Design a protein with these regions (language model features):
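C-terminus-biased signal that marks the final domain/tail of proteins
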Residues: 1-127
Length: 127
């Protein structure tokens, strides 16, 4: 797919990102803006094995290093990091104002509790 318009090479993704960023809707609420940001950034996810230089025989399926591992956005005013991962698309947040940075120990937060995402069956809700 390298060389095709809209491929997954960094220059192609950058040009598309500029175009999408210039057409983003102005939104008043930060949560709406974060969802809009994720909708835009999802256009640039790299599928497993599609990265430049990837080879299907060498693709690291376990580590998935050739694909988009996480997507993040910031609310700089409220100091909140938002992200979702390739294992769970639910948006999560880390509120930096709630973390004590005065200690000497490094704090760790797991990106995923479990590397899975459930699918909720809503068939019985049909009317």
């Amino acid at each position: 797919m390298i060389g095709l318009p809209g491929d997954f090479t960094p220059p192609s993704r950058f040009v598309r990102a500029v175009a999408w960023s210039q057409t983003a809707r102005p939104l008043e609420k930060s949560d709406e803006a974060i969802y809009e940001l994720f909708r835009i950034l999802d256009n640039f996810n790299v599928p497993l094995g599609a990265a430049e230089g990837s080879n299907s025989e060498q693709t690291n399926l376990k580590g998935m290093r050739s694909s988009t591992i996480w997507t993040s956005g910031w609310d700089l005013t409220q100091k909140v990091l938002y992200f979702h991962t390739q294992h769970n698309r639910r948006a999560r947040q880390v509120t930096l104002n709630k973390i004590d940075f005065t200690g000497e120990e490094i704090a760790h937060i797991a990106l995923d509790d479990k590397k899975e995402q459930d699918i909720k069956d809503i068939t019985l809700n049909a009317r």
